[in-house]
């Protein structure tokens, strides 16, 4: 398994997702650069200890070539390398590289990509690899990275990337072109909507996890949507641990997608057929498809409310009169 991740601005490169139960997301935390890679390595160590660590060839692969990471901040690269080494990855394969430029020639190379690219950024066309612009001519980094991930994956490779909500419903030609590319020419599997605040205090934007497999020949059928409300931490700047995390439920449901067809659109997760997504202009925002049940509120008759108000006025008047009498004594 090979995994690529790229840091962003310093304020965002401290955010990552942990691995759990063959699913890309366990919980949000702040771990420093290479957090994705470290979490993936820890997961493999827990689940495939004998297969990897008792096999010399596989252990060498684990230590040197299994994981790949790029960043444009040398300080973050040093911290990332140190993080990986302290977690048992002896020779971290991370490098100083501008992932979106012609400098990055990786194509059809990786089986897994986990990424938390910059939420907002704009580049000059001259600084972007020309093959990325062929899919969609855009300067927005959050869009360019999705195109890059498709290029870097092997056929059959899988990507889980955090994206700002705007990527899912943006109306520009570039937004639509990228969503169409993923839905029509590859296999879109899941959209996991996350609450605003999961990246505080670094960023307060609403985000989601998009999961897709590179096929080059379509394959999207039903897309799974999940509305995460609780990631196990408060949504303020302190991000303190709280009970009721949705993460275990996400993992369990994702592993049993066959059961999700029974769920209604009013529930926390549900499936949406490809045809409906196409009909909605490839809009991938969960609010486009989730149905909200409005409970009709019943209120007292206006005359009852007026009677109650008069009673309160009477009590207030009586109280004021009593207070005035006490003050006159």
What is the predicted role of each segment?
Residues 2-115, 120-122, 131, 139, ...:
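Conserved S-adenosyl-L-methionine
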Residues 101-329:
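A conserved structural/catalytic subdomain of Rossmann-like adenosyl-cofactor enzymes
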